[in-house]
C-alpha cells in the first residue's frame, strides 16, 4: 500500500466535461505555489486506472489529506445541465467520503452570469464570489493553512481565504 504523503495533493482539472479550465502548466504552478503535490487532470482519475465508481477514488482520498477540484470556464458552464448542480452521485459521493474520512474537499461549479463560482448543493456555498478563472480548494502550505481559498487571476501568486 502506498504511503500517505506529508503534504496535501492538488488534483486540478475538469471532472465532468473533459474541458480543461487551466493548462497543465498553470495547474502545476498552482500546486507548487500551494506546496501541494500535483497529480494531474481529474479526468485521468475518472477515465484512467482509477475510478470513483469502483471505489478506487476513495482509496486515493484515503492516502491524501486534501483534494483540489478546479472546474469549468464560463463557456463550458453555460452548457451544463441543471441536474448536474443537484446532489448527484458524484458530489454526494465526495461529500460522504469527506464526512467518513474527514477529508477536506471542495468540488465547485461556476455560475457564468455574473462570473462567479457556485458550489454543488451537497457541499455548500464555499466558492461564492470567485472569478471565472480561479481555482477553489482547501489549501496546503503556510499561506492557505488548510482553509478554503480562491486563487485568482490565473496567476496563482496568492491564496485568499474565503
From Swiss-Prot:
The keyword Disulfide bond applies. Induction: Expression is light-dependent and positiveley regulated by the GATA transcription factor nsdD2 that binds promoter regulatory sequences containing a GATC motif. Its main location: secreted. The keyword Secreted applies. Keywords: Cell wall, Disulfide bond, Secreted, Signal. It comes from the Eukaryota. Pfam families: Hydrophobin (PF01185). It is found in: Secreted; Secreted, Cell wall. One of its GO terms (molecular function) is structural constituent of cell wall. GO terms for cellular component: extracellular region; fungal-type cell wall. Disulfide bonds join 36-150, 151-159. Self-assembles to form functional amyloid fibrils called rodlets. Self-assembly into fibrillar rodlets occurs spontaneously at hydrophobic:hydrophilic interfaces and the rodlets further associate laterally to form amphipathic monolayers. Belongs to the fungal hydrophobin family. Aerial growth, conidiation, and dispersal of filamentous fungi in the environment rely upon a capability of their secreting small amphipathic proteins called hydrophobins (HPBs) with low sequence identity. Class I can self-assemble into an outermost layer of rodlet bundles on aerial cell surfaces, conferring cellular hydrophobicity that supports fungal growth, development and dispersal; whereas Class II form highly ordered films at water-air interfaces through intermolecular interactions but contribute nothing to the rodlet structure. This is Class I hydrophobin 3. It comes from Coprinopsis cinerea (strain Okayama-7 / 130 / ATCC MYA-4618 / FGSC 9003). The lineage of its organism: Eukaryota, Fungi, Dikarya, Basidiomycota, Agaricomycotina. The gene is hyd3.
Amino acid at each position: 500500500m502506498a504511503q500517505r504523503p506529508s503534504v496535501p495533493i492538488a488534483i486540478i482539472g475538469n471532472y465532468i466535461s473533459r474541458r480543461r479550465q487551466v493548462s497543465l502548466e498553470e495547474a502545476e504552478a498552482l500546486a507548487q505555489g500551494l506546496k501541494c503535490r500535483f497529480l494531474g487532470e481529474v479526468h485521468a482519475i475518472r477515465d484512467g486506472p482509477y475510478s470513483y465508481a469502483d471505489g478506487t477514488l476513495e482509496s486515493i482520498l484515503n492516502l491524501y489529506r486534501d483534494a483540489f477540484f478546479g472546474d469549468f470556464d464560463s463557456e463550458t458552464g453555460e452548457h451544463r445541465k441543471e441536474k448536474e448542480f443537484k446532489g448527484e452521485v458524484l458530489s454526494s459521493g465526495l461529500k460522504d467520503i469527506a464526512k467518513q474520512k474527514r477529508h477536506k474537499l471542495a468540488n465547485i461549479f461556476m455560475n457564468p452570469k455574473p462570473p462567479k463560482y457556485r458550489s454543488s448543493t451537497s457541499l455548500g456555498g464555499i466558492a461564492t464570489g470567485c472569478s471565472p478563472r480561479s481555482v477553489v480548494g482547501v489549501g496546503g502550505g503556510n499561506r492557505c493553512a488548510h482553509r478554503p481559498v480562491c486563487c485568482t487571476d490565473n496567476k496563482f501568486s496568492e491564496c485568499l481565504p474565503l
